[in-house]
């Protein structure tokens, strides 16, 4: 996975989160993609082309750990005219020097986090997927037996606006 922290995976955005199998967000759904990687002395360079988008899963009416009201996945919609066939793209560069590991990544395409709106019946929620651009940085520094970790992202989402987020930790 992308990222270094264990408590929150801010920058891990290629594969969609599976909230049915793992309400804590640890499990991911597979993602059809084309991945091109190039490795040299300046680091690992990766390009991802994502021709199809998998919607986030939510527990249904009979599912465990469901919210109220229930999310009706059959009513999902997209701001992109191509729906879930929008061609998303991502780039990642990772490298290390001595005790420092880092990675920079960028994703442009369908936002992995839908905005939930009440359906017309008022008893269920409708997931709406906008378009997003996200730039991320992850850093891990080793000091003796300690690992210091950080993830930072800047995101612009059609539905959720602009925001920054970060998480730090240690092992």
What are these regions (language model features)?
Residues 17-19, 54-56, 111-113, 155-159:
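Sequence/structural signature of outer-membrane beta-barrel proteins
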